[in-house]
């Protein structure tokens, strides 16, 4: 099962006690995958159409708990995809249609198409209702990448108006949601790991949140270890390169003027550097009598390099 589906499985089980929050979630589901059927300018039925059984199940339960409506469910083969089904939940009794339409404050936006249902901002004025609204939209039209691979949360809309409404709601939680046009759809997305954690908390997907956080912590630990290893490898390469040049300079001095022309301190460190090419400056300093520190060894080796450079000119 994908991580996105796990999140949806979890939020399907979330059911608000407050009626106004349930209305916000119903409005979100209908805005994402609902439409109305009209005749002579009058709304005859409200239909939710989805390929996702989780959406159908949640909508059915919300209608039952909120309005005591037992929705008619139609199951059809999906012509757009092989071996998949379409679930159609239809409310068509006049009183129920009127009650549902008015309670959810939905409205038809003819500029977006005769069937486009837009949610009135009054439905999501409370913070708790905003949470329910985001949860409903993610369930109906959202997806989330596996955190093992990448961090990405998105909800897809056919028009900018509904995308902008969600962006504004998510941003009210201090989360930086952005909108991108992908083909003919508007995608509201979040890519920062800690902000996706916040979104999971907003949707009350607490188990998924812990799973996401565990993966994120492990990834950060691995990245930290990799950076440390890379840094150490770079330091080793730097040390090896420096040691190779030091040895090359020392051998040039030996073959040109000999060590007898060096001071006692320089001769000692020159002999040690040749004898122990893999030793660190600290280790070389400890071999001297009396021992000297890393900076003292470095000073002598630089002096030898300077002598070699002078001889080459």
Swiss-Prot record:
Pfam assignment, any one: LAGLIDADG_WhiA
GO molecular function: DNA binding
Membrane-crossing residue ranges in chain numbering: none
Segments of the chain annotated as binding DNA: 280-313
InterPro entries for this protein: Homing_endonucl (IPR027434), Sporu_reg_WhiA_N_dom (IPR018478), Sporulation_regulator_WhiA (IPR003802), Sporulation_regulator_WhiA_C (IPR023054), WhiA_LAGLIDADG_dom (IPR039518)
Biological process according to GO: cell division; regulation of sporulation
Keywords: Cell cycle, Cell division, DNA-binding
Top-level taxon in the UniProt lineage: Bacteria
Record-annotated disulphide pairs: none
HAMAP family per UniProt: HTH_type_WhiA
Cross-referenced PANTHER family: CELL DIVISION PROTEIN WHIA-RELATED
Entry function: Involved in cell division and chromosome segregation.
Record family assignment: Belongs to the WhiA family.
Protein name according to UniProt: Probable cell division protein WhiA
């Amino acid at each position: 099962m994908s991580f996105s589906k796990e999140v949806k499985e979890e939020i399907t089980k979330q059911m608000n006690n407050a009626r106004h929050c349930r209305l916000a979630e119903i409005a979100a589901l209908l805005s994402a995958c609902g439409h109305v059927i009209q005749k002579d300018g009058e709304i005859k039925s409200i239909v939710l159409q989805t390929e996702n059984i989780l959406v159908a199940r949640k909508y059915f339960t919300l209608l039952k708990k909120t309005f005591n409506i037992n929705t008619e469910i139609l199951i059809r083969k999906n012509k757009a995809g092989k071996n998949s089904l379409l679930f159609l939940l239809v409310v068509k009794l006049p009183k129920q249609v009127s009650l549902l339409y008015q309670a959810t404050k939905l409205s038809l936006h003819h500029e977006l198409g005769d069937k486009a249902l837009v949610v009135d901002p009054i439905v999501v004025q409370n913070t708790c209702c905003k949470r329910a609204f985001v949860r409903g939209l993610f369930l109906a039209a959202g997806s989330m990448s596996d955190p093992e691979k990448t961090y990405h949360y998105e909800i897809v809309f056919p028009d900018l108006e509904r995308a902008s409404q969600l962006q504004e709601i998510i941003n009210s939680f201090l989360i930086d949601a952005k909108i991108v046009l992908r083909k003919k759809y508007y995608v509201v997305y979040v890519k920062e790991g800690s902000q996706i954690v916040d979104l999971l908390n907003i949707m009350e997907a607490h188990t998924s949140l812990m799973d996401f956080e565990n993966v994120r912590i492990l990834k950060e630990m691995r990245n930290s270890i990799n950076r440390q290893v890379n840094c150490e490898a770079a330091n080793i390469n730097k040390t090896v390169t420096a040691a190779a040049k030091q040895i090359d300079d020392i051998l040039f001095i030996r073959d040109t003027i000999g060590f007898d022309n060096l001071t006692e301190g320089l001769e000692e460190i020159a002999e040690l550097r040749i004898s122990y090419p893999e030793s660190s400056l600290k280790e070389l300093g400890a071999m001297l009598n009396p021992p000297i520190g890393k900076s003292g060894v470095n000073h002598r080796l630089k002096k030898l390099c300077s002598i070699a450079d002078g001889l080459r000119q």
